């Protein structure tokens, strides 16, 4: 069975995360459609293997991932798992031709992503996630994709970070944690440099570093991970095998 590690940071809001978690982007029909039964079978297999940490986001399948996770988690006791989702995007209904992610998300609701890192945007995002997930408690909220990879340039990334702090998004997350609505706050980010920037600007508990701390990419060891260790900030590594290049060799289009 997969082991658990206790996560505590200066409070009684302890979280026990299994060493392996389940990232649910593929449940949102990422790059190819899968059926509800296939999604549930994957979740059940992970559960039987001991996985008790599940991460999702409104972006994943434009809400489909959260909805599918709802169907699975409603069969489990709430105190048996840890659940994280993300804020920073709202999903607005639209016509199919205008929806987000043609060629990336398949057979998903007709919704358009709207970036919103404001106070109201964060609060509404959490409320909508509660509705899609069908639960009364989210453990971890990550601010999603404040990164260069998503926004196209460092200047654009810095502007989104400014909006997050100046327009109340950060304040909303702190308030949700202080009120006990969520237990921990952090960032779900593609670049360690952006995570480091956030860690220097705010009081975060945890970062989900997606695909940028692997056997091949070790730069985060220089300054970012020591900073997290000093401040007691925990790290979840998303996609630790990344493209799988160490197993397959170099292939065209690997990222």
Predicted regions mapped to residue ranges:
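N-terminal binding-site loop/beta-alpha segment at the start of enzyme catalytic domains
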Residues: 1-96, 104
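Beta/alpha (TIM)-barrel catalytic core signal, keyed to glycine-rich beta->alpha loops juxtaposed to Asp/Glu
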Residues: 6, 38, 146-255
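Short, flexible, mixed-charge acidic loops at enzyme active sites
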Residues: 94-105, 249-254
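Active-site mouth loops of central-metabolism enzymes
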Residues: 25-37, 107-123, 158, 255
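Short, acidic/polar
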Residues: 33-46, 118-132, 190-197
């Amino acid at each position: 069975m997969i082991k658990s590690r206790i996560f505590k940071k200066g409070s009684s809001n302890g979280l026990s995360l299994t060493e392996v978690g389940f990232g649910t982007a593929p449940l949102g029909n990422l790059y190819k459609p899968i059926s509800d039964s296939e999604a549930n079978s994957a979740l059940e297999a992970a559960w039987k293997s001991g996985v008790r940490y599940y991460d999702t986001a409104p972006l994943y399948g434009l809400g489909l991932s959260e909805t599918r996770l709802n169907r699975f988690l409603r069969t489990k006791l709430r105190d048996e798992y840890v659940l994280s989702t993300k804020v920073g995007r709202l999903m607005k209904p639209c016509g199919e031709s205008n929806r987000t992610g043609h060629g990336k998300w398949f057979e998903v609701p007709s919704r358009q992503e709207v970036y919103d890192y404001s106070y109201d945007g964060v609060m509404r995002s959490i409320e909508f996630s509660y509705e899609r997930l069908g639960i009364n408690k989210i453990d971890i909220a990550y601010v999603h994709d404040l990164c260069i990879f998503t926004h196209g340039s460092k200047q654009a990334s810095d502007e989104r970070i400014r909006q997050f702090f100046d327009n109340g998004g950060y304040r909303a997350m702190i308030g949700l944690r202080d009120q006990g609505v969520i237990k921990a706050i952090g960032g779900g980010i593609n670049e360690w440099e952006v995570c480091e920037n956030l860690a220097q600007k705010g009081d975060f508990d945890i970062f989900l570093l997606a695909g940028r701390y692997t056997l091949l990419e070790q730069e985060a060891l220089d300054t970012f991970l020591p900073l997290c260790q000093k401040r007691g900030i925990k790290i979840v590594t998303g996609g630790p095998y990344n493209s799988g290049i160490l197993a397959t060799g170099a292939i065209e289009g690997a990222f």
